[in-house]
Amino acid sequence: MVQSLKIILWGEEIGRLAWDVKRRLSYFMYNPAFLKKGLNISPLAAPVDGVGLMPVWGEEAKIYQKLPAFLADSLPDSWGNQLFELWRQQNHLSNTDITPLDKLSFIGKRGMGALEFLPEVSRERKAEKIDIKSLANLAERIFSERENARILPEESVTMQSLLTVGTSAGGRQPKAIVAINRKNGEVRSGQISGLEEFDYYLVKFGNSQYSSAELEMSYYELATMAGINMIDRKSVV
């Protein structure tokens, strides 16, 4: 169980997040050095001029999972939670010992926003080639089987790739953050920055039971036909 985390923003520690075992609630304390800058990163939930050195306690509402509101948005979403649950089972961790801080530590530096959470669960980042087809097939099986999903020995490498590129992307449907070589189409983890000749994409996997990815593509094309400026997209599988 993670007891405390450093919260990092743009390379600077803005404060610490801790877990109160008795209250089963988290609390956040600003870094005094950060407070002196007067940068109001959460003016409604945790204003720097109104909080000072007082703890910002987590919210009781289920949606916040015992975290302060401005930190809860970094938690894994529905799809990320499915992958986190598989990771927990693989590592033989009791569900009763898991707190929201463990989930934030699992996200670490891979979140979609600017916040980073240290220490992070150790997973070596490598710019190895990813088999996007195997990734898509495993993602669909996990999504459809839900809590009954079990990872086969021959799927262990693909599962590690999926944990790396798939847990931080929000939303309900399976997706992953990848880097695609613009010359040969090679796919690598999108968590590795600065890869030359690679463009970065949020990949949304299809579903053989429901054409969610195809529907999103249709809406994309309708938007471009209507003259709306959209980011680049491509079909990779």
Placement of each model-derived feature along the sequence:
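Phosphate/dinucleotide-binding and metal-coordinating scaffold of catalytic cores
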Residues: 1-237
